[in-house]
Regions:
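Short coil/turn linking the two alpha-helices of tandem helical-hairpin repeats
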Residues: 149, 153, 237-241, 299-306, ...
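Bacterial N-terminal signal peptides
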Residues: 58-68
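Active-site cradle of extracellular carbohydrate-active enzymes
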Residues: 271, 278, 286-295, 324-403
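Boundary at the C-terminal end of the N-terminal hydrophobic targeting segment
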Residues: 73-75
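Bacterial N-terminal signal peptides that target proteins for export
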Residues: 47-59
């Protein structure tokens, strides 16, 4: 009975438990250096053994009580983050939770051979949908793996070699496996763009049953899907050093930038902007801003190298002739990052300080148009007269990240000021205080907003080293994740509404797989936040 009381006491006093564990190991060391004649004395030996057995029982039992919350039992409760005073401990818990959420999601959303991802799973009915995930949704699993790998590397830097050694290789292998099976979304087609006609192999929206055989013509591939994949390929390269990731990232980058509208207006300026896809004319925030950060990263990769690249453009004099030019990769990538950033800021930043969805109101219509120049067919510019659509959190999040990365690369104060203003405006616009839970901020969770919000968190994290206010903004995500984990974890999964919980009607608890991978990625991103709080 006394032991049970001690265990319960220790369960809610983790700091004391840690001290006892330390004392236990000190005692073990003491026993090892105890004089041999004393250790071999029968009575002394029995007395020491009794002391250590009792102490060992208390330590093991208390540690067990602290580990129990990590199971999948529905009644699971975890000690609140507020009880953990050491920021490194918070970060380790974040990473462990991320890995638990990710591993569980792989179990329920992927086929047994891990080749296919399904879209929905209901933890109450235990039913998985037959509908397979789109490539965008599938990419969320790769994003989560990369975030976990980044967290593991951060833990190693902090001295937690054991956590790194036990998990790093497994997630590196998972990254390679997920990347390999993404080929079920790959397909090839011939595209006439603003400057050329060329064959490309890119990612389709939907998965097919054979690698490399997807239909990617027209609207069946979109540029933003390639951008999310590019981002994760470069991140994978930076984390593992695997050259194949970088090679594919640059290939897809060439495809995406081939979609840039380099036709010129009456003043000789580029019309600019990348349409949603080769089958669309509207130019979306999601098909432009996500490319800014990856381009800065490519610039940084090649900054000290002399690698060259040849690109195509439209002559500024006659405004029709297609030309080509060869320059250093580092210069090319940084210049394009600036151009995309400037286009989106000029056309889509609204009077609320956040970003609209897209440039629309096509004139004369929204059909892809072509023109003939010197006997050769090229894509033609379509006028877009107005910024329209909902302001989604990710369209501001990508621009915060882009501003932070461009500031790091250029040290131009304009990017820092842009990033600070957009960070403040985004938090004010997207985070609603006390609307569900006191002292918590609610972010929209309908539609695909859970994933969108993770992109906003990434922006807060990326700018926080140079804009300290972002630290309090990102903490709102930590609070919401912890609240959902403490109150609503069910069968190892979190609900779509972290603060509101599950539907009373269990049949309505069909959860998007990409949301679970988004939660895992968010926890992992918070785990290697070097600012600690």
């Amino acid at each position: 009975m006394a032991a049970r009381v001690i265990v319960l006491f220790l369960r809610f006093n983790p700091n004391l438990t840690q001290k006892l564990i330390s004392q236990y190991y000190l005692a073990v060391e003491f026993l090892q250096v105890f004089p041999v004649e004393t250790r071999t004395n029968y009575k002394s030996k029995i007395l020491l053994m009794k002391v250590f057995k009792k102490l060992q029982f208390v330590i093991v039992a208390s540690v067990f009580m602290m580990i129990v919350p990590y199971g999948y039992a529905e009644a699971q409760k975890s000690f609140p983050a507020a009880d953990i005073k050491n920021s490194h401990t918070v970060q380790e818990q974040n990473l462990r939770r991320s890995m638990e959420l990710f591993d569980r999601s792989m179990e329920v959303y992927f086929s047994a051979d891990r080749q296919a991802m399904y879209r929905f799973y209901n933890p109450d009915t235990k039913v998985r949908s037959q509908e397979k995930a789109s490539v965008w949704m599938y990419c969320a699993s790769i994003e989560a793996v990369n975030a976990i790998l980044g967290g593991l590397k951060s833990q190693k830097e902090k001295g937690n070699h054991r956590l790194f050694d036990h998990n790093y290789k497994r997630y590196v292998n998972l990254l390679a496996e997920l990347h390999g099976n993404a080929a079920y979304y790959l397909g090839s087609f011939n595209l006439t763009s603003f400057t050329q006609t060329k064959d490309w192999t890119v990612y389709a929206v939907d998965r097919v049953g054979e690698k490399g055989k997807a239909n990617v013509t027209g609207v069946l591939n979109v540029y933003d899907d390639q951008m999310w994949m590019i981002r994760e390929l470069i991140e994978g390269y930076r984390l593992t050093g695997k050259d194949t990731y970088l090679k594919e990232a640059e290939y897809l980058t060439a495809y995406v930038l081939d979609g840039w509208d380099c036709t010129r207006d009456n003043r000789g300026r580029e019309n600019g902007g990348i349409p949603w896809g080769p089958g669309y004319v509207t130019k979306h925030a999601c098909s432009n801003a996500p490319m800014v950060s990856p381009l800065v990263w490519l610039h940084e990769i090649y900054k000290t190298k002399k690698d060259l690249i040849t690109y195509r453009y439209i002559d500024i004099e006659d405004q029709q002739s297609r030309r080509s030019k060869t320059i250093r990769k580092s210069e090319y990538y940084l210049d394009f990052a600036k151009r995309i950033y400037a286009w989106q800021k000029e056309h889509l930043l609204n009077d609320r300080g956040v970003y609209d969805d897209m440039m629309g109101e096509c004139y004369p219509d929204c059909s892809v148009a072509y023109e003939i120049v010197d006997g050769i067919k090229y894509r033609k510019n379509t006028q877009l007269r107005k910024a329209v659509g909902t302001s989604f959190s990710y369209n501001s999040g990508t621009m915060i990240s882009g501003a932070a990365d461009l500031y790091r690369a250029t040290q131009s104060i304009i990017y820092l000021e842009d990033g600070e203003q957009l960070t403040d405006a985004s938090f004010q616009y997207f985070a609603k205080p006390d609307s569900q839970v006191a002292a918590h901020y609610t972010y929209a969770s309908d539609g695909f907003n859970n994933w969108f919000n993770g992109v906003l968190l990434r922006g807060f994290l990326q700018i926080s080293p140079v804009f300290k206010k972002a630290g309090s903004y990102k903490q709102s995500f930590q609070q919401n994740l912890d609240y959902g984990y403490t109150h609503f974890l069910r069968s190892g999964l979190l609900p779509q509404d972290l603060l509101g919980g599950w539907h009373a009607d269990t049949g309505k608890n069909n959860l998007e797989g990409m949301f679970m991978f988004a939660y895992a990625a968010q926890y992992a991103m918070l785990s290697h936040d070097h600012n600690g709080k």
